[in-house]
Amino acid sequence: MRKWLIPCAAVLLCTLVLALCGAAYADEAENITGSCTVKLCSKNFKAAKITDGLYTSYWESDKTTHPWITVSSKDPIYGLYLCFQKMPEHYQVQREKSGGEWETLYEGDTRFHHMYYPIDGYKHLRVYVPDKGKTTMGFNEIFAFGEGEIPDWVQQWKPVPEKTEMLFLATHPDDDILFLGSVIAWYGIEKQRNITVAYLTKSNTTRRSEALNGLWELGIRTYPVFGEFRDVYANPNRISQAYKETGGKDKVQGWVTELYRRLKPEVVVTQDLEGEYGHPQHKMVADAACTAFELAADAGKYPDSLALYGTWEVKKLYIHLYGTPREQVEFDWTVPLDSLGGETPNERAADAYAMHKTQVGQGRKSNGVFTPFSVEEFGVKRYPNNIFGLYATRVGPDIGHDDMLENIEGIEE
């Protein structure tokens, strides 16, 4: 009889493990958006544009009083995920009561353009602007979920901190992933540092959603900062023209100065002074980052941000590809990391870049040959994303050349 005990126990154990695994998978909430009925307050777009999961299409209401959308389902809804194209200053998430009246479940959180709301199994929901006066509301996507665990791709952001250890300043959504993505993953995930990503421009509302999707895929959970500057391509040989067409040198440098004062980073990391492939706005952002290193510490500059946040001395400023080996830190992004699920930082950055749907297929032409943007081609081969130069420091030179937080006091592992 004993000979049968071991195989029987093994079978029972395997059955139990499989049952538990099946239950774990079954616990994930089903995306029931496709079976929902979505109605819009204005008919200028089809509702399918905000339920196709593409983010590249959108619906925006007419400018009207109390814009709204409703989401109805034959099955109970346990989660509503809103990806705004045009977020009003105030909105409410409501459910329809049996008498046809609407009960407010949430006063809308306007800190995040992608926002998830748990719902208690209601079948008829409305997103509604209660304020008087005409306004607009729009969405890139909406999702409804059944009961269960929220899928990993649904974003639940932490707010922008009052104080960050490291600020990664990018020009456009996707620049952060192409050129800074691996170092962001290293410090933000592997090293668990308090990091914040900022963009000079969101470019447009679709690319703002792509930026959020890319950062989330990278593994970052702190909401980024978006500037409101125009996305332009000026004469690549004239930074002055890039400043002018972006909104003016004073405004751009003032915004970066305010960013330093507001977030109080110990270390700032930004793009190449030569603009990687020569993009004038990349050059401009790097120039502004360098100038703001001194401006943010000067009580005589930019009195408005001074009144709000005071002065701030950034300790170290790193520029992509800057300098000689004496000024540079160099990383190895080819080592798999447990914190990244066994991926290398470059592999994780490539995953994140795939979220930038509008940029996949875009690229550069050189000597008659077109090359699409990718982390492998532009972030590794052409403009190595593992090399950064120490442009300015208030804490002395780097000795180890492998850690941007070297010489920064008060930061513990």
Report residues per predicted region.
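Bacterial N-terminal signal peptides
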Residues: 9-19
